[in-house]
Structures are given as C-alpha cells and as structure tokens.
C-alpha cells in the first residue's frame, strides 16, 4: 500500500504519454474539507515489486483492501499558509473545542471565591403593575421571571488546592504581621527606642 504511494515520489519521472499508453491511474480528484480524495480506476494494477516473493501456485493473490482503492491526502500546514506574506498557517478551531479549553470548571487559574446568589423575598416590580399598553391584541406579554438562586457545583480538585494554598498564604501573612506588631510593642523594644531618643 505504501509502496505505491512512495513510488510516486521516489521513482523516475514517467515518459510523456503516447496515444497507445494507458491513462493515469487517478480517475477523479475531489477536495472535501481540505482532504484530497483520490479514487483509483478498477483496471489499475500496481507494477510488480522485484523484492516481493512469488505467490504459491495454488493460492490466489490477496484481495486489495479498501485503503488500496482510495487515499485521503491532506497537505501539511506549511503548504496551505494563507495571507499576503505566506506567513504561518492559521489553524481553525471548532467552537466546541474553545468551550472545552476555556470552560471555567477546567481552569487552574481560579481567583477569588465562587459567588452564590440567594433569592430573597420577592421585590415588587413597578413595571409589573402597569398594563401593557403598547402590545396589540394578538401579542402576548413576555413572562417576568424572578432571579433564581445560583448554586455552583463543587470546584474541581486542582481549583480547591489553589484556594487552600491561597488561604494558607493569607494565614502566614497574618501571623507575620501579628509577630511584627507584638515585637514593636514589647518592653525591650520600647526601652531601646527610649534610650536611642535620649542619647
């Protein structure tokens, strides 16, 4: 299978076609979504491979697989570069891939805490008491909805680890500040400061 493909690149160029020579083995080329589909003619046979062992006399040759019949070829990105300067190829991404990559539940860069909105007692809407005057007889007024309580699912373990680490850093900073305040208010420090001012 790959021998035929590599022979296209590494073999000597074919002589110019004569009227009595058979046509090219590629019968149809279609490009679909960046893929080049090449269908081989049914009558095409691969040239004999000199390294291949001859088949036993009692056995028929193996049937070609489906991959031998057609190829899906796509050029590398360096050959499909677009733009005036033929710069690097712009990769197009699927919007669903972006959702998976940028979804907050998968983010490791969690800052702050999650906000949970609780619904309080319903507040009266001044617009609700007014009749809908600008609607025609056939139109329905849009239903007004109360804001729902927003509950977040538990954060994934890496996000929790980040939050716990930040909480630990805050505790260490608070302890260091408390030690510094105690140090400045200790009796020995005050006596040293008084002696320094007197001299």
UniProtKB/Swiss-Prot annotation:
The lineage of its organism: Eukaryota, Metazoa, Chordata, Craniata, Vertebrata. GO terms for biological process: autophagosome assembly; macroautophagy; negative regulation of protein localization; osteoblast differentiation; positive regulation of DNA-templated transcription; protein localization; tissue homeostasis; ubiquitin-dependent protein catabolic process. InterPro entries: TP53INP. Pfam families: DOR. Dual regulator of transcription and autophagy. Positively regulates autophagy and is required for autophagosome formation and processing. May act as a scaffold protein that recruits MAP1LC3A, GABARAP and GABARAPL2 and brings them to the autophagosome membrane by interacting with VMP1 where, in cooperation with the BECN1-PI3-kinase class III complex, they trigger autophagosome development. Acts as a transcriptional activator of THRA. A motif (LIR) lies at residues 26-41. This is Tumor protein p53-inducible nuclear protein 2. Interacts with VMP1, GABARAP, GABARAPL1, GABARAPL2, MAP1LC3A, MAP1LC3B, MAP1LC3C and THRA. The gene is Tp53inp2. Abundantly expressed in skeletal muscle and heart and expression is highly repressed in muscle from obese diabetic rats. One of its GO terms (cellular component) is autophagosome. One of its GO terms (molecular function) is ubiquitin binding. Keywords: Activator, Autophagy, Cytoplasm, Cytoplasmic vesicle, Nucleus, Phosphoprotein, Transcription, Transcription regulation. The LC3 interacting region (LIR) motif mediates interaction with GABARAP, GABARAPL1, GABARAPL2, MAP1LC3A, MAP1LC3B and MAP1LC3C. Residues 47-64 have a biased composition (Pro residues). Residues 41-69, 117-153, 173-199 are annotated as: Disordered. It comes from the Eukaryota. The modification Phosphoserine is found at residue 136. It is found in: Cytoplasm, Cytosol; Nucleus; Nucleus, PML body; Cytoplasmic vesicle, Autophagosome.
């Amino acid at each position: 299978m790959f021998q035929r493909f590599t022979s296209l690149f590494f073999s000597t160029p074919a002589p110019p076609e004569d009227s009595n020579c058979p046509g090219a083995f590629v019968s149809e080329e279609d490009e679909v979504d960046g893929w080049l589909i090449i269908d081989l003619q049914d009558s095409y046979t691969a040239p004999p491979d000199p390294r291949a062992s001859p088949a036993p006399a009692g056995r028929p040759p193996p049937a070609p697989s489906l991959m031998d019949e057609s190829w899906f070829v796509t050029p590398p990105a360096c050959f499909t570069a677009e733009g005036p300067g033929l710069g690097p190829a712009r990769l197009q991404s699927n919007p669903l891939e972006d959702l998976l990559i940028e979804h907050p539940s998968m983010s490791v860069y969690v800052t702050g805490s999650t906000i949970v909105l609780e619904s309080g007692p319903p507040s009266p809407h001044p617009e609700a008491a007014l009749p809908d005057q600008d609607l025609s007889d056939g139109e329905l007024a849009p239903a007004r909805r109360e804001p729902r309580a927003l509950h977040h699912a538990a954060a994934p373990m890496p996000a929790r680890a980040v939050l716990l680490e930040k909480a630990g850093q805050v505790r260490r900073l608070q302890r260091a500040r408390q030690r510094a305040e105690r140090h400045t208010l200790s009796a020995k420090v005050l006596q040293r400061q008084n002696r320094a001012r007197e001299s």
